[in-house]
Amino acid sequence: MASDIEIAQKATLRRITQVASDKLGIADEHLEPYGHYKAKLSLDYVDSLKDRPNGKLILVTAISPTPAGEGKTTTTVGLGDALNRIGKKTLVCLREPSLGPVFGMKGGAAGGGHAQVVPMEDINLHFTGDFNAIQLANNLLAAMIDNHIHHGNELDIDVRRITWKRVLDMNDRALRDITCSLGGPGNGYPREDGFDIVVASEVMAIFCLATSIQDLKERLGNIVVGYTRQQKPVTARDLKAHGAMTVLLKDALKPNLVQTLENNPAILHGGPFANIAHGCNSVIATQTSLKLADYVVTEAGFGADLGAEKFIDIKCRKSGLRPDAVVLVATIRALKFHGGVDVKELNTENLDALEKGIANIERHVANIREHYGLPCVVSINNFTFDTPAELKLLQDRMAKHEVPVIVARHWAEGGKGAEDVARAVVEIVEKGQSGAAGFKFVYDESLPLMDKITAIATKIYGAAKVNASAKVAGEIKKLQDAGYGHYPVCVAKTQYSFSTNPSARGAPSGHTIDIREVRLAAGAEFIVMICGDVMTMPGLPKVPSAEKIDLGDDGKVVGLF
């Protein structure tokens, strides 16, 4: 069986100018090509689309994943190809992969099998340089903070209260907590510092929530980097850093156009993680896609409790976007995992474990319908070892909830294998069941910050309560009193469970969500609440994917999957 990269390397790609012209009607002068198979759309062209009507927005999310993931990106690509196959002009709209998980656990994030976006190697490795630009903008601000302190500290920044961290697009646990400026007076004032992964940075969040280059600059200026000795906030604007940061990001802000294996257009732009950030591609990319196609298929990271909740409560709240339908991705093996089966035994039929694990998908479906107010289709990513008895058990259970459960084979068959899912989505959207009318947020923005996270925890996670130490509660109160109480909350927690305990599988209830840390993201306009043991700078696994990635004698990349 061919690997993902082997399938991608054998594909016949069309020049991106041809894809843009034939599929989307975009003339060459609106494209900025990066080689033959990827290009950026000019911001002038993006602005020219604003008066066009919007297409239909389909959100792809998933059950709580296993470490291997459940195939959201693969489903998003396969569904996009399937919709095109049945005559619906469709654009796939995805996040860009981070090098951290590419070299860490996942080994690639451009879909899989015969449902991929290509050129796969380029997309997974550097792509058009957007993440590097975001990293540089973030670290320029960090350098200007320490430089300002070194040259007299006119703003009276308290070095003990600097909240801005440096970032790197790599999993590197050794950089989580460091001491910088060692080596003598010429190197600045020594202080504690640390690195986050670039996809958790506020610059990434701002990049993905900005609606224009002007909005980007304004938001960058609003970043709070720390506090003075009088405990007044210090911003990037105070340091006169936001203009140069905007210059570094001006080309990155242009959406990236590539294609699927079936030569259908796809826009990839931005890439915050959903467990430690808000988990959605850029607003500019999504809004542009909706002007160019009748259907737009996008994804939100990890499970419907994380990426989808943030898509609803942060991205939609800020942008005015409204999904028309949700596709919930699941696998039989993941449901058995949630039923208590060891990873090594997931390929063996186990109806008892599946019965228990179905509680996980039931809660996600209930959340989507009851708390997000959206219609839902369940797409089962098919594996050859799924048995008819297992599929029947799942379909029978979900039939009680009147939720369509459709087996999809896009990994093996491309768009053809997802046509049934595509037809189910079209039926929802075009027969008056579209979710835009019933759409709702999990909480009202006027609620206090603690009430917001309590609403997420009790409604979405099934928790009994939220706990905050006196120190954390005090920090939340300060943010509330300082005028940030109307901001939405971005919860950072494990993706593997509804709780903050990654080993609590299924649908745990009655647990407590412990808030460990609170961070103000004034430029992104949300409050990050870090819960449990989740880290904003991941580490590599014992056997990282980097060990298998290489360059063959023929000059081709091997080991990406």
UniProtKB/Swiss-Prot annotation:
GO biological process: tetrahydrofolate interconversion
Enzyme class: ligase
Catalysed conversion reaction: (6S)-5,6,7,8-tetrahydrofolate + formate + ATP = (6R)-10-formyltetrahydrofolate + ADP + phosphate
Molecular function in Gene Ontology: ATP binding; formate-tetrahydrofolate ligase activity
InterPro entries according to UniProt: Formate_THF_ligase, Formate_THF_ligase_CS, P-loop_NTPase
Pfam families documented for this protein: FTHFS
Protein EC: 6.3.4.3
Gene3D superfamilies for this protein: Domain 2, N(10)-formyltetrahydrofolate synthetase, Formyltetrahydrofolate synthetase, domain 3, P-loop containing nucleotide triphosphate hydrolases
Keywords, sorted A to Z: ATP-binding, Ligase, Nucleotide-binding, One-carbon metabolism
Keyword Phosphoprotein: no
Positions contributing to ATP binding: 66-73
PROSITE patterns xrefs: FTHFS_1, FTHFS_2
Pathway membership, UniProt: One-carbon metabolism; tetrahydrofolate interconversion
Keyword ATP-binding: yes
Family to which the UniProt record says this protein belongs: Belongs to the formate--tetrahydrofolate ligase family.
Name of the molecule in the record: Formate--tetrahydrofolate ligase
Record gene name: fhs
